[in-house]
């Protein structure tokens, strides 16, 4: 799909919307010609108190246009979020006008839709208000909205169970062997970034050392440990052992109630890696289909 952006450079938001609504398409940033039948022109005009987004879209010759006005307040960080939400909503509505269909999760992309109802309920909204917000503002189906709110309630209950001096740790491994067909992320596979893997691991170990010193100085304990990605099992068994050995040496893992590593795709897992995980006390793994 040819994409033309006017008045902004929010490529990520537009590409996420394209992948969500038109999963077979890939972004091409070139001028739109009269012979092209699959394209989107996303325009933004921003003022002090709001913005106007217009999306003109053609998919296989069927065209639709949607225009959306959205208020904008707050600091630049807050305005950036509102701007991206407006672009995402407008693109979704234009695409819906072309296809006549909507994914169960509506305009939401990525892997953390539960953050929205969790944030709302933490601020005082009822579960019903959070559910209605997902359906009204993000076009999520009633079934998925109910699922998200149920998960948000479980998340808030888990947060309430944390003691004041406890923290949860996420260790990110942002590499994948190849791109999965179901993945909505705009990313590169490890074949193109393999040279960065070892330097990244070196830097990660330095950061873990620094974190260990902070936890020791502040007297905080570690409640949960989760290694995700990407695909952590893109690392070799030797690299995994090196990483988890350092974690054991400098982090207070003995108090963890959950020690999880996202094993990712079955083709990245072998016996040697599983033995490394088990040997370091990992009690839970997740495997993608």
Per-region residue spans from a language model:
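Short, well-ordered secondary-structure micro-motifs within conserved domains or adaptor modules
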Residues: 2, 18, 24-78, 87
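Accessory, often N-terminal, substrate/partner-engagement and coupling regions
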Residues: 76-102
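Flexible, glycine- and charge-enriched loops at secondary-structure boundaries
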Residues: 81, 193-201, 233, 237
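N-terminal [4Fe-4S]-dependent radical SAM core
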Residues: 99-102, 122-169, 218-219
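Canonical Radical SAM [4Fe-4S] cluster-binding loop centered on the CxxxCxxC motif
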Residues: 166-199
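Conserved SAM/AdoMet-binding glycine-rich loop
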Residues: 205-289
């Amino acid at each position: 799909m040819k994409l033309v952006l006017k008045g902004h450079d929010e490529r990520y938001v537009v590409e996420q919307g394209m992948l969500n609504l038109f999963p077979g398409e890939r972004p091409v940033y070139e001028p739109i010609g009269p012979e092209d039948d699959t394209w989107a022109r996303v325009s933004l005009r921003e003022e002090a108190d709001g913005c106007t987004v217009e999306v003109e879209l053609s998919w296989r010759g069927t065209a639709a246009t949607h225009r959306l006005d959205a208020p904008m307040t707050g600091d630049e960080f807050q305005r950036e979020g509102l701007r991206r939400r407006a672009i995402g909503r407008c693109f979704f509505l234009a695409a819906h006008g072309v296809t006549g269909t909507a994914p169960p999760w509506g305009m939401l992309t990525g892997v953390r839709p539960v953050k929205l109802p969790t944030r709302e309920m933490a601020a005082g909204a009822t579960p019903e208000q959070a559910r209605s917000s997902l359906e009204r503002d993000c076009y999520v189906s009633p079934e998925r909205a109910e699922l998200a709110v149920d998960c948000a309630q479980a998340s808030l209950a888990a947060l309430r169970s944390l003691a004041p001096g406890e923290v949860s740790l996420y260790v990110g491994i942002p590499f994948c062997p190849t791109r999965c067909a179901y993945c909505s992320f705009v990313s590169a596979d490890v074949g193109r970034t393999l040279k960065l893997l070892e330097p990244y691991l070196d830097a990660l170990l330095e950061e873990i050392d620094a974190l260990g010193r902070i936890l020791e100085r502040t007297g905080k304990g570690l409640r949960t440990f989760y290694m995700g990605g990407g695909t952590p099992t893109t690392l070799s068994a030797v690299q995994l052992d090196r990483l988890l050995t350092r974690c054991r040496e400098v982090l207070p893992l003995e108090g963890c109630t959950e020690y999880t590593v996202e094993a990712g795709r079955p083709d990245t897992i072998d016996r040697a890696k599983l033995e490394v995980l088990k040997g370091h006390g990992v009690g839970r793994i997740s495997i993608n289909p």
